Amino acid sequence: MIKCEMHLHTKGGSYCGQSMPREIAQEYFNAGYKAVVVTNHYMKSLFDYYYTQRTEKQKVKYYISLYKEVKKYCGEYGIKVFLGLELNPDCMNTPTASPAAEFLCYGVTEDFLYGNLRLYDLTQQQLYELFEKNNILMLQSHPFRSYCILGDPRYMHGVEVYNGHPTQQNNNYKSEQFAEEHHLIGISGSDYHARGGIDGGIYLPHNINTDFELVNYIKNNKLKLIKVNANES
């Protein structure tokens, strides 16, 4: 089995990402990881105000380019890289919290993103129904963080039961209880933003090489989670 990061942000994808792809590749190699999923924030405020590209497709191209850059540098260390999202349905935000609800999405492809622009304009239910048709998994990240809104369990495949962000109060134990109560998939992620932030993920078989294989493994197997600082969250 190999270690796989499920929640990772890069510099250039948002205001909060601080590490460049070259740094990310070296740090994950040093930590013994053989796979990562790049899950930069995918939200209206970033696409409308942070990204400088003019058209929606140009913005998607830029978003994908961040993943490709991580893939380039990780390839030098033999680390597999998958494309993901941390998607914020804009309708779930509040005047005091944005993003108030985010979903880690696995199995997305470049063609899917180009063919389905402005995903953040859809409701949770609309997203779930669209993803079901396209073999994409949708799991709420850090659902019990203090400012977050809990999504409808009927319209998600799972939740992030361990979020390793070092400065947030994630109440991960509540996420575990929620997943068990609603028979949802539970995953773990570091929520990596900067150097020193690696402490989560899952174990994968060595032969998982495509996004399709990643999704099917998560769907059909009991996952072994990486939770380095579980007692502190």
Question: Where do the PLM segments sit?
Answer:
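An N-terminally biased module of ancient metal coordination in phosphate/nucleic-acid-related enzymes
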Residues: 1-88, 173, 194-197
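Hydrophobic anchor at the start of a short beta-strand
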Residues: 36, 138, 186
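Charged catalytic cores and adjacent phosphate/nucleic-acid-binding surfaces used
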Residues: 1-6, 10-14, 21-26, 91-111, ...
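Extended substrate/RNA-proximal surfaces in nucleic-acid metabolism proteins
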Residues: 42-165, 213-227
